[in-house]
Amino acid sequence: MPAPFECPVIRQRNLAVLLLGLAGNPSAPPEALVRLAAANIDRTQLARRRDLPAQAAVILADDKDANLRSELAANPNLPAEVQIVLARDVDAQVRGRLAEGAEYFTTVGVHARRFPGPLSDDVYELLARDPEPKVRRALAFNRHLPDDIRARMLDDHDVRTAAIAAAEWHPAPTARISELLSRATGAFGRELLLLRLDGPLPAEAARGMLADIDSSTDPANSAGLLRQIAATAVLDADLTGRFLTDLPLRAAVAANPTLDPEHVAALAHDPDNQVRAAVVARRGLDPALRESVSVEYDDRSSGNAVEWLLAEDMSEPDQLAFARSRHQVFRKTLAMRTDLSDEAVGILSADESFAVRLFVCERQPNAPGWLLAHIAAGWKSYSRWDMLAHKNFPADAATALARSDDPHDRVVAAAHPGLPFETIEALLADDTDYVRRRAATNPSLPTDRLMTLLEADEPAVVSGAAANRTLLVVTMHQVLDQARL
């Protein structure tokens, strides 16, 4: 057995597998990542790393593989000098990937949506003048696009680019609504535009769109747009009457902040459950009226959050009041926030609603271990991985999952640091290769055992051991030396 600080002699056939594992090792230092950038392996995982050093990014940006450069372009943490290089890339796919600034998912919180920061102004200017319409269209989707550049793109000679630039303005200026509607002429584009308006839709603009819909040969295609008009327009008596007589629009108009109090009070007793739910979710509604309204919610649905509650500045008494609300939608939305007091988390942890308890496990840094264990035992979705990584997840519950007959249970538990050594060893000999690989990443493996795994005959185990965050940096460099990097 090799000494703890001595790298084993790596079999040549395992060298590429080792390098792939190192590329995903969260503890790999910047200098190791720079060396890996020149490796003859699939480096897409390396290109996606948020901690990719600038020097490594420069190397990857000059690579001949367009798919690799495209993955690099999607990395939200690139230095400006690399962004400029990619904005001038010969491949339109690479430039478009850089331009879109698409959302990505992270396990900080729980696979919560994150959006990259803005690109440099020079990059935006360059991409806005790109000769390929598909690149400019991708840029028009970018939520960080400066307003002056977006305004210029409203006059793009490519009609589709101009329409996207209008519909994706976030927040869209109500003062320019006529101009924006003249560009976003499709029903779906207009629906998106109204969703992003920075204020209520002027009644005159609403009437203009309604006239277009009424004269359309396919009014059914505008059902979503109609609901958005009803929810955002400045309501007068005529508009209110029209919307309230159309049953599919009653819930939308019930959510409209300009609806007069008399109609709000009447709709609170509407026979339609969706209409009452829309009334209940109104911002500024009298708490007594809200709590008097009966609404049924789909307990297995993660949708229907109360958006304003997510951003509301709340005191602890406010938190506790919503945590005890009769309405599941408020308790569920509250559970999505990460600034809750221990008392509020305690109340929500014992909630009768599965959806509320699930969000406690997914979003709360102080979620109780007993609840994490209970939910993870039966919850098979992606967020279970985050629950097992939660600092409060009990070791005995992880061990029970690791000994399950289901490999999907075993793999999710295989990297838990609280597993007994004999359980980890059993997982390393598991019948399923992805379980064995995951077990090799367990941070509780002793250094000498980890070193022997680097010499294993099986690529899955070798790759997992190389990705283990406790692997010594000196060993990483010794592997890179053997690869002549």
Q: Where in this protein do the model-derived segments appear?
A:
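Alpha-helical scaffold segments
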Residues: 1-485
